[in-house]
Amino acid sequence: MSALYDNEAKIRQAVGMLQKIVNDTSVPRNIRRAATDAIRNLQDQTLSPAVRAANAIGILEEISQDPNMPMHTRIAIWNVVSMLETVKD
């Protein structure tokens, strides 16, 4: 059971980091919208933690290629993706 709690802790930490991006007004609106979508996917309790993480990673990797993204936001997204890649069922 500890793996499940560990996965949930990682997901909660990722949501917190994404929430900072959503609240940062220097980040373009489309990137904040993608971060909001990733948060929504991470909080969907009907799916397993690994599926939720994979869905969020897909959204974040797609948006991380945006040339309008500030560098500090890109690094934060890469950190979130790295954390979510460790979530396993």
Curated annotation (Swiss-Prot):
Family of this protein: Belongs to the UPF0147 family.
Annotated organism of origin: Sulfolobus acidocaldarius (strain ATCC 33909 / DSM 639 / JCM 8929 / NBRC 15157 / NCIMB 11770)
NCBIfam families: PRK04330.1
The protein's name: UPF0147 protein Saci_0891
HAMAP family per UniProt: UPF0147 (MF_00342)
Record's signal peptide: none
Top-level taxonomic group: Archaea
Parts forming coiled coils: none
InterPro entries the record matches: Ta0600-like_sf (IPR023130), UPF0147 (IPR005354)
